[in-house]
Amino acid sequence: MKALHFGAGNIGRGFIGKLLAESDAEVTFADANTQLVDQLNHSQEYHVRVVGDNQHTDVIRHIAAVQANSDDVINQIIKADIITTAVGPQVLAKIAATIARGLQLRFEQGNYAPVNIIACENMVRGTSQLKQAVLAELPAQYHAQLEEYVGFVDSAVDRIVPPAAANDEDPLAVTVESFSEWIVDKNQFRGDIPPVQGMELTDNLIAYVERKLFTLNTGHIVTAYLGKLAGYKTIREAIADEEIQQAVRQAMQQSGEVLVKRYGFDRQLHHAYIEKILTRFANPYLVDEIDRVGRQPLRKLGAEDRLTKPLLGTLEYGLPNDALLKGIAAALHYRNADDPQAVELQGWIEQDGVEAALLRATGLKADEPCVATIVAEYQRMA
């Protein structure tokens, strides 16, 4: 099985690339970082330190790498059995032209073996969005072949992989938590489903996408924004604060009630899942910076993302949401001079006021009662 993975960063190496390699795939990473590509090709292996209850180090061998915008990556697309990505939502659309070019040449060369593409991003239906971007780049005469031979498989992914600390002795090493979850929509594959260890199949993906978004992502971001206000630097420090931990637990429980209503998740099992996530945030072996988790607040306040989307669910079902409102108020306070979105958000607030900035970022309507509550909470936090 030939696998091409876009994004040789920490998630690519420590999660998706690792699972592919451990499933005996020939893994080639594609990345824009020339130094990283050269290092991978020179060593042809890297170390993954798995931390938690059962610590160990895995050696991932027999890997290669290519430049993301080179002829080499096109050749890999022509030959691949599976193509995966972990490049971030902002970059995903930018690789569509490369994928389209590779698929066009694949068809022109007569390779009609099925190939499946899986975007492993913090997005709802990210692969479906990638498909539309690829179709926009691919000449129309190849669209029917794409529909028949190329599977665009949506997924939900969950593993905390903080940025690696600088390590001159082993620059490719990455540290990950022991927990991981990769769930894919089994109905979207073309041909045989690739035998990838750790890749779980479901026919109800959206429930698991929202479970992850409303729980891990919601909890993570509320921890980050409340932690930032309290002066903490890492997620572990913030979640050790009893007041913050309780607010984060309540936010996840409130978003969880939406999941129980919408998808029929078992409330008791979901509460256990929440407690597991709180334990993961407190992992003493993971140094996860608050500014890594909190960055890009405009995206994270968006109507389809981890704060506003669960809030809209509570409004839909008439459920409590005070902890979620507190998280959104804390997001409006987020300041980070190195993050363009944080700077832009604070500019909106200074220019137009907090309510106008809130409405612009979230898409909420001014007459929603929760808007006044968020603004009041924001003022209380000031």
Swiss-Prot record:
InterPro entries: 6-PGluconate_DH-like_C_sf, 6PGD_dom2, Mannitol_1_phos_5_DH, Mannitol_DH, Mannitol_DH_C, Mannitol_DH_CS, Mannitol_DH_N, NAD(P)-bd_dom_sf. It is an enzyme of class 1 (oxidoreductase). Gene3D superfamilies: N-(1-d-carboxylethyl)-l-norvaline Dehydrogenase, domain 2, NAD(P)-binding Rossmann-like Domain. The keyword Transferase does not apply. NAD(+) binds at residues 3-14. Keywords: NAD, Oxidoreductase. One of its GO terms (biological process) is mannitol catabolic process. One of its GO terms (cellular component) is cytosol. It catalyses: D-mannitol 1-phosphate + NAD(+) = beta-D-fructose 6-phosphate + NADH + H(+). NCBIfam families: PRK02318.1-2, PRK02318.1-3, PRK02318.2-2, PRK02318.2-5. PANTHER family: ALTRONATE OXIDOREDUCTASE-RELATED (PTHR30524:SF0), MANNITOL-1-PHOSPHATE 5-DEHYDROGENASE (PTHR30524). Belongs to the mannitol dehydrogenase family. This is Mannitol-1-phosphate 5-dehydrogenase. It comes from Tolumonas auensis (strain DSM 9187 / NBRC 110442 / TA 4). The lineage of its organism: Bacteria, Pseudomonadati, Pseudomonadota, Gammaproteobacteria, Aeromonadales. The gene is mtlD.
